Amino acid sequence: MTEFHSSCSRCVGRCFYCGGKSIKHGFTKENKQRYKCRQCHKTKVCSYQYQAYQKYINPYIISLTKEGLGIRSTARILKISATTLLKRIIRIAESIPQPSLKFAKSYEVDELRFFIGRKSQPRWLVYAIERETKQTACFYIGKRNNNTLNAVIKTLKNAEPTAIFTDKLKNYKTLIPKHLHKTSRYQTNHIERKNLTLRTHLKRFQRKGISFSKSSRITTAVLRIYFWGR
């Protein structure tokens, strides 16, 4: 429970959102004392009964998502609604900035096939990793066409890479300049190994499993947390 130390007759503590002074602001339906910040005007109570309002929930959501738990599994462990969890995942993902690409680096690009809702709706996850750091540089989800591939390739070309390594998929030849494109054997080992890790951690990408995605938006948010969340 948060303790408030009074410094005047009205101010009862500091706001943990902005650090401003908080004052009493009536009571909740459960007869709990409410507090309001005089600076950001946000309200709070000392202790929340619903777990989703706890400050530690968001870090737990990030941690459990990166460990590969599904939506309902995470909701059961944290004792919150699955609907609330979906909204929170989207909000967390939107707050995670995409890392800036470094200039004059080499990248590996590969694609994973999965489906949304049913197997008759296949999708591609196309992403790139920097060869030196092995970190994910960018990714895109879409249908199996050049537009999906080009969304990643175009981002990499803006960073003026020294080389882009891919498999021998014919689509890449029309998208990547010849002097940058490399398709030598064993040159995509790092991203191929990352594919295995990704399929192991996130069940929706497993080849033969009963888990699947219902929404491209949620899948994009989960990947953003998995790749760049901390």
Descriptions of predicted regions:
Residues M1-R230:
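Residue-level recognition of single "structural anchor" positions
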